[in-house]
Amino acid sequence: DTLAAPIVSSGRAARIIMKTYKKHYDVYPDMFIIEGSMAGGHLGFGADDITQGKTQSNDEILSDVLAVIEESGADIPVFVAGGVFDGKDMAHYVNEGAAGVQIATRFIATNECDASDTFKQAVVNAKREDIRIIKSPVGMPARAINSPLLERLDAGETFTARKCNGCLTACKKDDS
């Protein structure tokens, strides 16, 4: 069996997912991952809401999701992701009712991560002012480190893929 672990960014999303799973499969998700607005990568919030600080905090989302689960009578563990920085953060969320946390960005600089050493160093050296919200190629807001590539995209330059490696869908690529 495969565990179902949907990522949610609100109690409303958790409620909808629980209702849908129950209606169609007569089960609830095995766990929820709360991904707050401080997460790296793709974000489940509007870009304006993120940049204007109009998103719920991880604490607020956790409280809402736990309330939805409690209302249903289900026993679904919840893990918090996005902006979890250290052991103090981990302990805080567990004390607030989370089963645990999920951390990703902190592990980019490890030997086990297959990212390039240049990218790893950029992550290690990044300061708060180096991070920005962009519109990703799939159209979602995403957190990224400012770079010459982003500056070129801001200037209107476009790029075409030269080679695909395990793409999930077809993309425009340069066959030259």
Regions found by a protein language model. Give the residues of each.
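Conserved active-site-proximal phosphate/metal-binding subdomains
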Residues: 37-79, 85-176
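Conserved alpha/beta-domain cores
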Residues: 1-48
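Short beta-strand/loop segments at the ligand-binding rim of alpha/beta enzyme cores
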Residues: 1-12, 69-81
